[in-house]
Amino acid sequence: VADGAGADTRARIDTTYYYNYSEDTDRGFLPVTLDLNGNGLDFTGIDDSNVYFDVNNDGWREHIAWAGAQDGLLVLDTEGDRTIDKPEEISFARYHPGAVTDLEGLLAFDTNDDSLLDRLDARFKDFAVWQDKNLNGLSEEGEVLTLTERGIESIHLASDRLPQTLANGDVQLFGTSTY
């Protein structure tokens, strides 16, 4: 911050966002993260993250923890352009009434009610994995591949509901599943 006379100061400003998980408001940012290399999920905590993403559709990009470069986020490519820049492309709880997590939100896309997201579901082709290899929070060429391109045939929509806290407390997992 600088004043008109040229004096300046640098200070860290932390903000905390509280989300009201009700039917009528944003349910927060609880993305489905995929372990792509089989060694468990890795996350970059907020203090080490360079990622800013508009998580609540208010036009402001918030500083957030992020999936590690070897893992990926499940995304809904709403425009089919492999550009992921809207919260509704990365956060799915808003799509299913009563969903608290994004894995629960995916039930809205399970059109044949078999508790799987697979090719038998109408919008399976619209889902992809975003592997942000350079951890900048921007979906760039080669980072967003369809589930089919990734060799993912199905995602189980039931969680083990075993919570975990990772990335120095910056990431709260609400459970795991398989694909």
Question: How should each PLM-predicted stretch be described?
Answer:
Residues 1-179:
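Calcium-binding acidic motifs and repeat modules
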